[in-house]
């Protein structure tokens, strides 16, 4: 069995598990980013120098000193330069273990979750916990940019193919932002569908929108984690379109109370922090 198979087979994802009511940071499981980056040929030198996996956690709860349950929404930012990504089911199980644990304050919960995730990721992690009264002001918004989804084209292939991007960037130099809501891939372990929207901001030769849309749709039967899909899209665009500047940002729908929104860029980019219609 290969190292990759050994790591993936050890994950709780896709396996029957028991839920615990006692705080247990050992429930968190790491997936080395190196596993997928080796396949992409970017382990030694990533084509991006900025990036993070931005999680929104909708099922965060604990007990205060009086035993009264508290509920909140957490935003977690995991640096893309961390050694590991966090496996999502293990994260859910970990948060469940916090439910019946007493903490002195919201700030203590923030600190403990941030510390535990940092150790698991072997890198920088930031955690911000919001009271529901704060988060209710989050408005539903959309990515800025031009949506490429309304093209009158026939699609007959849903197997991943980077070849759609061949000769996709020719002609004039532009700076533009393109958006698609048709991104769909499948979990690497369970093959459950992952639904997302993707924003691509670039400076370079104008990218053919039909070829780009066909490429994005080809992820429809592709099995890979959210973070890995975004790094694959980024790497493929750099390989075939060769833009001077590039940011790829995806926002996925939630599963199990968690949503993952990765972005990668090769310049000092600041992605929109928004809540989309499907989130």
Swiss-Prot record:
SUPFAM superfamilies: Tetrahydrobiopterin biosynthesis enzymes-like (SSF55620). The keyword Aminoacyl-tRNA synthetase does not apply. It is found in: Cytoplasm. InterPro entries: GTP-CH-I_C/QueF, NADPH_dep_7-cyano-7-deazaG_red, QueF, QueF_N, QueF_type2. Pfam families: QueF (PF14489), QueF_N (PF14819). Keywords: Cytoplasm, NADP, Oxidoreductase, Queuosine biosynthesis. The active site is at residues 187, 194. GO terms for molecular function: preQ1 synthase activity. NADPH binds at residues 88-89, 255-256. Substrate binds at residues 86-88, 226-227. Its main location: cytoplasm. Belongs to the GTP cyclohydrolase I family. QueF type 2 subfamily. Catalyzes the NADPH-dependent reduction of 7-cyano-7-deazaguanine (preQ0) to 7-aminomethyl-7-deazaguanine (preQ1). PANTHER family: NADPH-DEPENDENT 7-CYANO-7-DEAZAGUANINE REDUCTASE. This is NADPH-dependent 7-cyano-7-deazaguanine reductase. It comes from Haemophilus ducreyi (strain 35000HP / ATCC 700724). The gene is queF.
């Amino acid at each position: 069995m290969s190292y990759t198979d050994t790591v993936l087979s050890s994950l709780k994802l896709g396996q029957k598990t028991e839920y615990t009511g006692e705080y247990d940071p050992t429930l968190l499981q790491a997936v080395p980013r190196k596993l997928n980056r080796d396949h992409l040929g970017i382990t030694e030198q990533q084509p991006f120098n900025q990036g993070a996996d931005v999680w929104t956690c909708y099922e965060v709860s604990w007990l205060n000193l009086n035993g009264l349950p508290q509920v909140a929404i957490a935003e977690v930012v995991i640096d893309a330069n961390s050694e590991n990504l966090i496996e999502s089911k293990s994260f859910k199980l970990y948060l469940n273990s916090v439910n019946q644990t007493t903490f002195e304050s919201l700030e203590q919960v923030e600190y403990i979750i941030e510390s535990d995730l940092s150790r698991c990721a072997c890198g920088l992690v930031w955690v911000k916990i919001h009271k529901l009264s704060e988060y209710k002001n989050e408005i539903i918004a959309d990515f800025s940019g031009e949506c490429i989804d309304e093209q009158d084209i026939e699609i007959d292939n849903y197997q991943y193919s980077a070849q759609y991007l061949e000769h996709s960037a020719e002609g004039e130099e532009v700076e533009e932002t393109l958006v698609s809501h048709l991104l769909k891939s499948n979990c690497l372990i369970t093959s459950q569908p992952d639904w997302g929207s993707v924003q691509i901001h670039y400076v370079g030769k104008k990218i053919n929108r039909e070829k780009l849309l066909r490429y994005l749709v080809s992820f429809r039967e592709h099995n890979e984690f959210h973070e890995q899909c975004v790094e694959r899209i980024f790497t493929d665009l750099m390989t075939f379109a060769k833009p001077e500047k590039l940011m790829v940002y995806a926002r996925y729908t939630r599963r199990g109370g968690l949503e993952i929104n990765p972005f990668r860029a090769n310049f000092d980019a600041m992605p929109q922090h928004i809540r989309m219609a499907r989130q």
